[in-house]
Amino acid sequence: MEQSCEEEKEPEPQKNIQETKQVDDEDAELIFVGVEHVNEDAELIFVGVTSNSKPVVSNILNRVTPGSWSRRKKYDHLRKDTARKLQPKSHETVTSEAVTVLPASQLESRSTDSPIIIEPLSKPDYRNSSPQVVPNNSSELPSPLITFTDSLHHPVSTALSVGGINESPRVSKQLSTFEVNSINPKRAKLRDGIIEGNSSASFPSDTFHTMNTQQSTPSNNVHTSLSHVQNGAPFPAAFPKDNIHFKPINTNLDRANELAKTDILSLTSQNKTFDPKKENPIVLLSDFYYGQHKGEGQPEQKTHTTFKCLSCVKVLKNVKFMNHVKHHLEFEKQRNDSWENHTTCQHCHRQFPTPFQLQCHIENVHTAQEPSTVCKICELSFETDQVLLQHMKDHHKPGEMPYVCQVCHYRSSVFADVETHFRTCHENTKNLLCPFCLKIFKTATPYMCHYRGHWGKSAHQCSKCRLQFLTFKEKMEHKTQCHQMFKKPKQLEGLPPETKVTIQVSLEPLQPGSVDVASITVSTSDSEPSLPRSKSKISKKSH
């Protein structure tokens, strides 16, 4: 009889004297399975671990083997004696539950088919009427078990102790919900049912099911903890402080809610981690391509120099003399009644193929109050804003100011600004300005000869502005030196190279029926000034 008792007490007494380790390992992961508060009769609750292939059959709870009653009776007395020996004196006064939980490293090495037994620590007169759960294979007996013990004398407060395989004195430590979560910072936390962080579960593909009996004591001060792990995702469950009472959890509903929240969180994280393409800064065309430069800023000394006309022998000051010469040459040209008179613009002196095109040019460019589809540098009109923007991108640079006053180096993107500047700032001086190429003369005779040359000869028209030159060399020097970015727009200051900028004619569509605003995207690297060509190469080309 004694020999049979020794054979029967192999598995569980060894489990009760297992070593308990301090729960301070950073890699340890606590998995709370369930606690049962029993007043009279305790039932053994089997927590099944389903493998990847087949779930555990729950009929094992109802399995009855021959001689099981005698084994339970004998083992009950042995377990009571062992519990009395192992229980410290202070255990009667401490109102806590000792929960033995394996570290994560041991849980990972444990076979997925090993059972987990939850059993109460009973009084000496405690009667165990539930069937004993025996492992399937004898080789699994030494495998670590998770044991939940529960005090029946006092209100319950949770205490967790980590047990190891080797034998050592038992260490118990009361832990709050915050301490349990702070043991392993990698462990997932639940707040308001939303998963925070990634859970490093030991069984990513297994499913843990906890079967609890209905208790008559209601639960108070329930806190959220991790008691279920399904397919690697944690579920919120009740973690009590005073009384223990678990209700059945609708896993299907919780799973659906958890999946929906996970989808929302994944979309939010994608929006945060994904770096979307930033919107390009919007700059108006007038601010990006047009500008003015005041030059030296010092007014020229007034000399009140007079100039004598070679045709009518009139003596006039510089500005009036310039107007007088213009009227003389226009009158002479009109008397010839040539075809050029009907196709040349009297404002910009540009020639057009037909008089109709000349008339359209005058109406769109020189008579319109505020033309929106006109390039102010070229003084040419375009059909739409989009065509104008494309023209500006292909032919001009940001801050391009090709019209220069050669007296004080005043610059502008608009020819009329330079002409007005000369007539106001350089009036009554010794300088004469050519309206075709902005060249400066000091005497009347060379000025009138130069002026007649522009009328009589086929001038070299600059393809990027309205200026005309008598020689090809002068035209190329002008294009190389003046058609560059003279001043960087304020909107581009501080922007790194290769920055994309959106150019628009206006912020709102000008036409009532249109919805979209015409725009074009340019790179700041395209606006960098190019090196001017040497004069020697230009002179060779002119010959």
Curated annotation (Swiss-Prot):
For this UniProt entry, the molecular function terms from Gene Ontology, in alphabetical order, are:
DNA-binding transcription factor activity, RNA polymerase II-specific; RNA polymerase II cis-regulatory region sequence-specific DNA binding; zinc ion binding
Keywords assigned: Acetylation, DNA-binding, Isopeptide bond, Metal-binding, Nucleus, Phosphoprotein, Repeat, Transcription, Transcription regulation, Ubl conjugation, Zinc, Zinc-finger
Q: Classify the main location.
A: nucleus
Put simply, this protein is called Zinc finger protein 280B
Q: Name one GO cellular component term.
A: nucleus
Function, as annotated, reads: May function as a transcription factor.
Stretch list, region Disordered: 1-23, 105-138, 518-543
Q: Which sequence ranges does the entry mark as zinc finger (C2H2-type)?
A: 343-366, 373-396, 432-454, 460-483
Localization per record: Nucleus
Superkingdom, taxonomy of origin = Eukaryota
Compositionally biased, Low complexity: which spans? Answer: 128-138
Tell me, what's a Pfam family for it? Answer: DUF4195
Organism for this UniProt entry? Homo sapiens
Which residue stretches does the UniProt record annotate as biased composition, category Acidic residues? 1-10
**Phosphoserine PTM sites in chain numbering:** 68, 70
